[in-house]
Regions:
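Membrane-proximal intracellular helices of multi-pass ion channels
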Residues: 1-445
């Protein structure tokens, strides 16, 4: 048996996921280093190529070079492929090639596909994977067609490529854009702040990509019968609606007071959708108030939903923590939502994920603030954007040193593969003790 196969047999699911994502990132970085990937046909420094490849595979959107003005058509195509692989997941994309080639999917592969999709069971996972691939490509195609007239009007024939690229980037919640120029880099979609077609299409793609593949399947199976949905789908759809509506009202009333009513509404809606977790922007985040930035950090931290293209701690994690708090207030033993009781493991996992992401984002912000002598609040914005795989920035990332960029690379990688995945992979060899220790009460609060 070849050595690589022996190694693969020894790896558990969590370790193999990490290695596959790392391999795709390194291959992407190697391609981006090539002179053909840059507009000026020069070699891009490896650390910049690695940062960009990590951001693409982890569907983040933080960049150190402007995507449109630095990368050539080849480089942009590489980025789009990396975004697609990162958005759908390495295992999902790999399984799709197996399905296309007619190869039989083994039981171990089905188990990995189940984990990648966050599916409740192995049964029907091949059918679900095929549905996800077909639906993803269809939605991206529809998104590109919707934006095509606007971009072709403004850019001519090259507008076709821009429509396709932005559709893939939006659906995969990546946030990479092709709007910058050498004179005006990193402008994102600010030129389209009042354009309803671009705003609504990008927003719709972000939301659909961020609600999760299982939610799609639930809606397809049960149509609009909300009461028939799985508990997870109910929580995701409710949380998503609230996390769009409430921030939109805040931005409308307190942040965006200039311009026409339509422009204010589009700005408010877009800035409530994109932090979870796309990274496009139609407004300058440096012009927001401290409260507006704080709300954006909170939205980035929560992110999208499990089994989706989005990052963050996930809407379900936030919902379980809130439900558990209400259960404590009411002196209930278990949190409840929609007439169902939460399992204890979900509460423990939610608390662990919240703690891990909070500690990592704060630690990263402290280190970057110290190394770069920058305000802590601005560094926290960047680190939260990285670990939640968002891509929004206050303009700091392109000017950070190699150490600080390395921290952001680590946070982006953690955010995409999952904090618990990293922990489980690291502790795979350890065995938990079966002994039950004596219990003792400790006062909290």
């Amino acid at each position: 048996m070849p050595s690589y196969r022996r190694l693969a047999c020894k790896l558990n699911y969590f370790q193999s996921i990490i290695l596959m994502f790392a391999a795709v990132i390194l291959i992407g970085a190697a391609l981006l280093v090539l002179p053909i990937s840059a507009q000026e046909r020069t070699v891009t420094p490896f650390h910049e190529a690695l940062f960009t490849a990590t951001s693409a595979v982890c569907v983040t959107g933080l960049v150190v070079r402007d995507t449109a003005s630095h990368w050539s058509a080849f480089g942009q195509a590489v980025l789009m492929v990396l975004i697609q692989i990162g958005g759908l997941g390495v295992i999902t994309v790999g399984a799709s090639f197996s399905l296309l080639s007619g190869r039989r999917i083994s039981l171990s592969q089905r188990g990995r596909m189940q984990e990648a999709m966050s599916a409740p069971k192995v049964g029907g996972i091949v059918r679900l994977t095929g549905f996800v691939i077909r639906t993803s490509l269809m939605i991206e195609g529809i998104g590109a067609l919707c934006m095509l007239p606007v971009f072709c009007r403004d850019f001519g024939v090259s507008g076709i490529w821009k429509a396709v690229f932005h559709s893939v980037s939006a659906f995969c919640n990546a946030g990479f854009d092709l709007m910058g120029t050498p004179d005006m880099p990193f402008v994102s979609l600010t030129a389209y702040r009042a354009d309803p077609v671009i705003n609504l299409t990008i927003s719709a793609l972000i939301v659909v990509g961020g609600v999760g593949f299982l939610t799609w399947d639930d809606v397809r199976t049960n149509r609009l019968c909300f009461h028939r949905y799985r508990l997870q789908s109910k929580v995701i759809l409710t949380a998503t609606a609230l996390l769009i509506l409430l921030p939109t009202l805040y931005f409308l009333w307190f942040e965006f007071k200039g311009g026409t009513q339509r422009e204010r509404l589009l700005l408010s809606l877009f800035q409530s959708v994109t932090p979870r977790t796309a990274g496009f922007n139609t407004a300058d985040y440096t012009s927001l108030s401290s409260s507006g930035r704080g709300l954006t950090i909170l939205l980035m931290f929560i992110g999208g939903s499990p089994g989706s293209t989005a990052g963050g701690i996930k809407t379900t994690t936030a919902a379980v923590l809130v439900a558990n708090a209400f259960a404590v207030f009411r002196r209930q033993k278990s949190p409840e939502m929609f007439g169902r009781r939460m399992e204890e493991k979900a509460v423990h996992d939610a608390a662990a994920i919240f703690t891990l992401y909070l500690v990592l984002s704060l630690t990263g912000a402290f280190v970057i603030s110290t190394v770069e002598t920058l305000p802590l609040s601005e560094c926290l914005f960047e680190t939260t954007s990285a670990i939640a795989t968002v891509g929004l920035s206050l303009g700091l990332t392109p000017h950070l040193g190699i150490v600080s960029q390395g921290i952001l690379i680590f946070l982006m990688f953690i955010g995409r593969v999952g904090g618990l995945t990293m922990i489980y992979a690291a502790l795979s060899g350890s065995k938990s003790s079966a002994a039950r220790l004596p219990q003792e009460r400790i006062t909290v609060g």
